[in-house]
């Protein structure tokens, strides 16, 4: 679904000083005074500002919210030094600072819109910011890496066996078994998952890569795009050990605000999690969980209608 681009009353890109780091945000809205929403990108290492146009075409969040698109520490057109100063705990602390900045600017509580690892970061950050956060929308959250890795490993082995092609068998053998603690293995798995239609429905890895590169060039320019690609691998190399140990089911964050979990039925990365059980484990009163048909890991792009409706009532 593509939405006609709306005229924006607010559209500004700012550099914020966040815990000793310069980080960029783009703030967009169709009218002043709308409630704030912060988008927390998937990762690790994946920037967000190059996807603003895609978010606006698919989700049109600016109709109802002042949307804060945030490039996390070390991501996008950041220095090489910034990409070496990352950790899961640091990204959580940085998000809490962005929440405080947004709440102070708007004098309203913030809705967090997290994706994949960004959803996990949002959950952890919200646990310490209940006075500033009104709710969390957790799209395809990373909840327990060990279980997710095992489910994906089984999924890939079954798909490769069914395909019966030597090329895929070689790719799976080169990938090896989890955990994946280096950027190259993490990226190899992403290629297989994308081409098996588990990330964004109907999009191959090469199609998403082209989309990524075009978006980066438009947003960061040639030199900035080279930095963004370099930073992606650097941040992954620094953070994958933290991600491998992530387990929010055994150690749930203490949240008093509602969480709205959204999963795609075709998402191998979250297939291990029983969405119906989550409201009793993570989240305050009003927490919900839904698994959406005809959607992969990027459920917000595959089924923007469902995600929009959740955001409107969150």
Listing of model-derived features with the role each one plays in the protein:
Residues 44-57:
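The serine-hydrolase catalytic nucleophile loop
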Residues 49, 72-88:
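Glycine-rich "HGGG/HGxG" loop immediately N-terminal to the catalytic nucleophile
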Residues 60-77:
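Conserved alpha/beta-hydrolase
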Residues 92-110:
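Conserved acidic catalytic loop of the alpha/beta-hydrolase fold
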Residues 108-151:
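Conserved hydrolase catalytic core segment
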Residues 157-159, 163-250, 257:
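Alpha/beta-hydrolase
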Residues 255, 261-263, 267:
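Short beta-strand/loop motif that positions the catalytic acidic residue
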Residues 295-304:
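Catalytic histidine-centered segment of alpha/beta-hydrolase-like enzymes
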